[in-house]
Swiss-Prot record:
Protein name, entry field: Neuraminidase
InterPro entries listed in its UniProt record: Glyco_hydro_34 (IPR001860), Sialidase_Influenza_A/B (IPR033654), Sialidase_sf (IPR036278)
Further information: The influenza A genome consist of 8 RNA segments. Genetic variation of hemagglutinin and/or neuraminidase genes results in the emergence of new influenza strains. The mechanism of variation can be the result of point mutations or the result of genetic reassortment between segments of two different strains.
Any Gene Ontology CC annotation: virion membrane
Length: 469
């Protein structure tokens, strides 16, 4: 090959290589732009939905790596999929209840700044559980705690802390309220907060930290709600509210709320005669509530709420071992599943129960006359058979030498089933302990277990003589 041919050959090869490199640089540039704008192609979401992203797979040979050394590839981050809760899993099968949490608020109040509270409850978002209570606008070691036996004042607020964290001075005050309910729909918290004049109160509906809706008193006689968690299924939440006499006929309505906005209000129907302070739980696709009849019955009313067509029915727990306080002795108490038993119906106390096939799990004070002690058990046939009284799996939660109070249910979704848990309010101070001028509480919390368990008693535990007056 003569020199001219060599020059031509080298030039041709060089030109070919340069052309290939140029084309590859164009390809890399196009790839970079594609990665930046189309790394994750998301379809336009439907209303209130976030669709999953599908990554584009880009293949390239090893040679391209050389040219990517100084190239920055930015990836688009897909938003996390957030869905409404539907509670469609079955209820967990349990043998009883195991200890879960205790906040010791009163004992801690002897030497620290802890809120004066009552009407506590527990509710969980998909990842964590929280405790709520209605604060009295004061700490215990404070002269403002004098007279906190009273239920309603403009200073009461709904408090919210992670479960197990007592209500210290840094506690969030969610809203102004002397009656409340809270629940998480899978996306955000809904708080129902009632406050104002007894004859003209207001219920505010706060969703995701914003006031979305409100409703005024419809009977001008202490509008009030559950004092425990509401329930949301597929984005619609339901809460039971009553306005009217505490010892006679009242007007109970069931409200349906979507992202804080009231979408439907239904009147109570069925055979229940008086409804207060319901403890509600999801029973997919519906919601079931066990309430307090403060007028005619020491057997507890049941409300069944259809979340699809908004229909409502009511009755009474069948168990002849009734759940309210005060009540008759077990040997003489009755329930026919449909009507109030007309046995010591007034006043009553907030409580809970839940169905388990034909049986019923329930909790109640040990004393039939006072809010002292606390026990749980299952009644065989207690959900389906009138006046059933066969009791099994009894547990003492608080011995009868110590005070209890309100109690309520909350539900926790596990990997395969929905567990039922409950809390007990441990009231201290007035009216029973007149050495002090305040009324406040701590709580103890138990959850259902399929395992074995032991015995014990979990009272408040504060020595009243150590407490500020």
């Amino acid at each position: 090959m003569n020199p001219n041919q060599k020059i031509i050959t080298i030039g041709s090869v060089s030109l070919t290589i340069a052309t290939v490199c140029f084309l590859m640089q164009i390809a890399i540039l196009a790839t970079t732009v594609t990665l930046h704008f189309k790394q994750h192609e998301c379809d336009s979401p439907a209303s209130n939905q976030v669709m999953p992203c599908e990554p584009i797979i880009i293949e390239r040979n090893i040679t391209e790596i050389v040219y990517l050394n100084n190239t920055t590839i930015e990836k688009e981050i897909c938003p996390e999929v957030v869905e409404y809760r539907n509670w469609s899993k079955p209820q967990c099968q349990i043998t009883g209840f195991a200890p879960f949490s205790k906040d010791n608020s009163i004992r801690l109040s002897a030497g620290g700044d802890i809120w004066v509270t009552r009407e506590p409850y527990v509710s969980c978002d998909p990842g964590k559980c929280y405790q709520f209570a209605l604060g009295q606008g004061t700490t215990l070691d404070n002269k403002h705690s004098n007279g906190t036996i009273h239920d309603r004042s403009p200073h009461r607020t709904l408090l919210m802390n992670e479960l197990g964290v007592p209500f210290h001075l840094g506690t969030k005050q969610v809203c102004a309220a002397w009656s409340s309910s809270s629940c998480h729909d899978g996306k955000a918290w809904l708080h129902v907060c009632v406050t104002g004049d007894d004859r003209n109160a207001t219920a505010s509906f706060i969703y995701d930290g914003r006031l979305v809706d409100s409703i005024g008193s419809w009977s001008q006689n202490i509008l009030r709600t559950q004092e425990s968690e509401c329930v949301c299924i597929n984005g619609t939440c339901t809460v039971v509210m009553t306005d009217g006499s505490a010892s006679g006929r009242a007007d109970t309505r069931i409200l349906f709320i979507k992202e804080g906005k009231i979408v439907h209000i239904g009147p109570l129907s069925g055979s229940a005669q008086h409804i207060e302070e319901c403890s509600c739980y999801p029973r997919y696709p519906d919601v079931r509530c066990i309430c307090r009849d403060n007028w005619k019955g020491s057997n507890r009313p049941v409300i069944d709420i259809n979340m699809e067509d908004y229909s409502i029915d009511s009755s009474y727990v069948c168990s002849g071992l009734v759940g309210d306080t005060p009540r008759n002795d077990d040997s003489s108490s009755n329930s026919n599943c449909r009507d109030p038993n007309n046995e010591r119906g007034n006043p009553g106390v907030k409580g809970w129960a839940f169905d388990n096939g034909d049986d019923v799990w329930m909790g109640r004070t040990i004393s039939k006359d006072l809010r002292s002690g606390y026990e749980t058990f299952k009644v065989i046939g207690g959900w389906s058979t009138p006046n059933s009284k066969s009791q099994v799996n009894r547990q003492v939660i608080v011995d009868n030498n110590n005070w209890s109070g309100y109690s309520g249910i909350f539900s926790v979704e596990g990997k395969s089933c929905i567990n039922r848990c409950f809390y007990v309010e441990l009231i201290r101070g007035r009216p029973q302990e007149t050495r002090v001028w305040w009324t406040s509480n701590s709580i103890v919390v138990f959850c259902g277990t399929s395992g074995t368990y032991g015995t014990g008693s979990w009272p408040d535990g504060a020595n009243i003589n150590f407490m500020p007056i």
